[in-house]
Swiss-Prot record:
It comes from the Bacteria. GO terms for biological process: cellular response to acidic pH. It comes from Shigella flexneri. Keywords: Plasmid. This is Uncharacterized 9.1 kDa protein in spaS 3'region. It holds the Pfam family YmgB. Gene3D superfamilies: 1.20.5.5260.
Length: 80
């Protein structure tokens, strides 16, 4: 199943008021990925977050990316 639209967090049930920063990052990545391919899956978001975690030098930002990754993995089934 793929998600169309830019509010990926809403689609997978992340409480955006509780995870404001992480939701913003996830939705921003969704917008980046969605433009060229028109469909968006949880694996697209996971791949981008993994790349951002591995390339980020700022430990605070890296931790935010890690939290965002945990949210996506927790809220989505394996086969989306």
């Amino acid at each position: 199943m793929c998600y169309m639209g830019v509010n990926f967090c809403n689609k997978i049930g992340i409480d955006q008021s509780e995870f404001e920063i992480e939701s913003s990052i996830i939705n921003s990545i969704a917008n980046e990925v969605l433009n060229p391919i028109s469909f968006l899956s949880n694996k697209d978001i996971i791949n981008v977050l993994l790349r951002k975690i591995s390339s980020e030098c700022d430990l605070v930002r890296k931790d935010i990316y890690r939290c965002a990754l945990e949210l996506v993995v927790e809220k989505t089934p394996d086969d989306l």
